[in-house]
Amino acid sequence: MLELQHIGFEAEGKEILRDVSLTINDRFVAVTGPNGGGKSTLAKIIMGIDKPTSGRILFNGEDITYLSITERANRGISYAFQQPVRFKGLRVKDLLKLAAGKDATITAACNVLSEVGLCARDYIARELNDTLSGGELKRIEIAMTLARGTQLSVFDEPEAGIDLWSFQNLIHVFEKMHERTRGSILIISHQERILNIADKIIYVKAGEVEKYGPREEILPALLGAQTAGACKVLTDKLAAGKEGGARA
């Protein structure tokens, strides 16, 4: 489905990604690693928000390296930001109908809101402005991606801001999304519960893919590397996530 060939990216004279080659066609793929390692940049390059300095991107065999965001979306790629964008003047129902396509109904829009734990009656006519919290916007953006039902969905830390909503519900949304699309879901996350549902894990550090393989092989290796210091940032975040879950 998605193939990255020797991807490199530089910004302001700094090398962010170096010779990244990946093939992604599994159900759930998690991307993790230290902060500043290049994870979000990798996701933005897949969506076309950033263009690689070198290398090629293939989607279903087509070279999409220099296609625009809209062109990639039309081919079946969607992206959910770590910090959702506010669209002043645009209502939730309009956003969801745009995401789902011209044949979308209000009923369908209400259904996807319910699936992400929001009461449709309270949110369907709301504007996407400062009256919505970050957590509410995050769930609306997840609902938008669910409504689109693309072949490849990319999520940048989808768990951020959803502390009042069951984490298990988020995982259920991903599973339901896959049932509908039979596509791939790429999730950037530090959460062990996200990593535990992944078919494969990509570990990105200092702009390089240091590890990539089945969860059963990669996750124990990452957790076991704590004493050597190679995975300190990851394990710190996993511990923080567990404490947050216990408080909830």
Q: Predicted regions: what is each one?
A:
Residues Q83, G89-T105:
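Q-loop/switch helix immediately C-terminal to the Walker
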Residues E208-C231:
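Conserved beta-strand-loop-alpha-helix hinge in the C-terminal portion
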Residues L2, E15-D19:
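Conserved structural motif at the start of ABC-family nucleotide-binding domains
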Residues V154-P158, W165:
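Walker B catalytic motif
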Residues G55-E62, A108:
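Conserved ABC transporter NBD signature motif
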Residues M47:
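Helix-to-loop junction immediately C-terminal to a conserved catalytic motif
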